[in-house]
Each structure stands twice: as structure tokens, then as C-alpha cells.
Amino acid sequence: MTSPTRRRTAKRRRRKLNKRGKLLFGLLAVMVCITIWNALHRNSEENEPSQETAAVSNTDQKKEVKKKTAKKSEEQIKTVDRNQKISNYLKEIGFSGTAMIVRNGEIVTNKGFGYADRKHYIQNNPLTSFYVGSSQKALIATAILQLEEKGKLQTSDPVSTYLPHFPNGQTITLKNLLTHTSGINGHIEGNGAITPDDLIKDIELQGIKRQPGVWDYKDSNYSVLAYIIAEVSGEPYEQYIKNHIFKPAGMTHAGFYKTYEKEPYPAVGYKMEGSKTVTPYIPDLSQLYGAGDIYMSAIDMYKFDQALIDGKLYSQKSYEKMFTPGSSSTYGMGFYVAPGSYSNHGVMPGFNILNSFSKSGQTIVILFSNIQNNAKLGQVNNKIYQLLNQE
């Protein structure tokens, strides 16, 4: 028989063991909870949009992967901000986009402002891609002048040389198309996809408004030129632009609309409606064949301008031809000609582009905005020139 003393000792031992067991179980439970919380917190952090990574489409979840796999050289691109007055001015007016400013061969500003993607809080950066709208007409004009130098065509040729059924085609010249003095009615842009052949047929069907010689800006003038580039060069116009403009100019982030979402940093376009910012609908850009189907970064536009200035893309004779006004509008071939500078402008749903450089080639101002209508970029451009001249 067990003594009372032994029984009490055994009970105390069991109570201690029970307490230790409960304590151990509690510690294990706490450790499991901490492990689960850490895992969930880490996942939530990975899913939060970074403000310094690539812009993502509202509907394309694959962009999250693209942000993490972008090339190191792109991730590490440095912002240049050597003129605080210009930066402060752009911030004050609410500029959203990328500004690239070069003075006497030195980069003064190469900086993103505002958000490339407002939904995901992703900021614009120097490599953000934008649709450039009508600013691409300068590239089409360059291609035509290149083909003229190669003896493939003449800007004085009548359009009927290449399009026999074109209305008034024996009178309208390629130069009339280049300078927007053709007199055509042009294609009425729709929303759906259209082939280049069907686009040209519709332009022909629309007929003419007047005889050539009077300024009348039409995207269709440059759609016809893009079609002729393909006919004369023997390769799709997109491929010609890639091989003979993008490549020699070093425009590594320029491309055509079908690959826009594959770029590391594609901007989402916006428009102001009262105090609200909305994302406007962009029609199928086959409707803007040769006249608004290209995208690029501000750096790419700078490289294009510099290639023109340096004579990398054509001769001095072609340069002078491009920058000679074709009418009282002061529009040459892809650029407007002002007393001290050359410029072009592109506006699309959600995008606003201004590209300008001085006649000396010493000053280049490029403003790519992903808000269509919150700033008059012509006035902004003039203000930047003033601030540069104060230095």
C-alpha cells in the first residue's frame, strides 16, 4: 500500500508535468502562428505594386512577372535632374510623364513625373513607353526621303505612279502628302481593325475636297505614304522603319502598337474630365497606319532627333528639304518650322507629345505625357526654353 506522502508527491509531479506540457504546447502554437503570419505578410508585400517598377495594364496580370524580370540596365537607369527650376515648374503644373532635355550635348533633365499607372501607383521613369501619335509622321517623312536618296522614288512623283486609282492622283504629288497640301478628304477613323489595303481603298473612295496646294492636315496623307514605303521598299512598312530608322538611330525601346504591352514600362493613358482622371478608350491603331501606330520612350525620340541632326539617317540635302515649310502653316515634312526651332506634336486618347529642337541642334526638349489634356505642351516647351536661357 502506498503511503499518503508518496501519493502527494506523485500528484505534485503529475501537476508539474501537465503545466510543462501546456506551456510547451502554447509555445508551439505561438511559433506556428508567427510562421503563418510571416508567410502571409511576405506574400502581401510581394503583391503590392512598387512605385519604381514597370507600368502594368489594368487587365494584364502578366505585367507583375515582367516587373521582376526586367533587364538590370533598365532597372538601374538613373534619373538626371540638373535644373531645379525646370523640375519645380513641371511639378507645379502637374505634368505627368517623362521630360528629356539636352543642352549643348549635356543631359539637363531625364526624369519621370507623376504616375505611369495610377491604379497600381507605378511612377513614370526615363524609360516609360508612350504612344507618340502624329509625332511619328517625322519618321515616315524620313523614310520617304531615304528612299528618294536611294533612287526608289521622287517626292515630286505623282501619287498615281504608285496608286493608279488614287483620286486626282496624277496631280497630287508625294510632296503634297508630306506637307498636308494634297486636298484629299481622307479616311474617317473607326474603332475596329482594318488592313492597309482596305484603308487605302477607303481613302480613295472618299475622294478629294480641293485641288492640291492648300494646307489641310489629314492623317490619311501619311497613311498613303506608309503604304508607298511598303510598295517601293518591298518590305512591310513596319519592318522598314525598324531596319532603317530604329536600328541606325539606336531606338531600342521603340516599336509598333501590337507589342506595346510587352515593353517593360508601358504607360497607361489618362484624360481629365472635370476633377476626375479617366482612362479613355483607344481604337484599334491599325486605323492610324503610318500616322499614330508607333510608341517609344523619350530617350528614343531624343536619339531620333540627334540622328537627324548628325546626318545618320539621310543627307544634308534631305535635312533641308524636311525643314522647309510647304505652306503658310509652316509645316515642312513631319515638323513645324519656327524662327528658332523645329517641333512636332502628337495627341492621342490618353497621350500628349511634344518634340522640339533648336535650329542649331544644341537644345532638345522632349515632353511625353500620359495625360491627354492637363497641360498645353507648346506653352510648357516655350517656358522651358526661357528657363534654359536664364542659366
From Swiss-Prot:
Record's note on what induces expression: Up-regulated by sigma-X and sigma-W factors.
Keyword Transmembrane applies: yes
Ranges of compositional bias, category Polar residues: 50-59
GO CC terms, sorted: plasma membrane
Compartments, record wording: Cell membrane
Traits of the deletion mutant: Cells lacking this gene display no visible phenotype during vegetative growth or sporulation.
Main location class: membrane
Entries under Pfam families matching the protein: Beta-lactamase
Record's keyword terms, sorted: Cell membrane, Membrane, Sporulation, Transmembrane, Transmembrane helix
Gene Ontology process terms (BP): sporulation resulting in formation of a cellular spore
The protein, known as: Putative penicillin-binding protein PbpX
Source organism: Bacillus subtilis (strain 168)
Source taxonomy: Bacteria, Bacillati, Bacillota, Bacilli, Bacillales
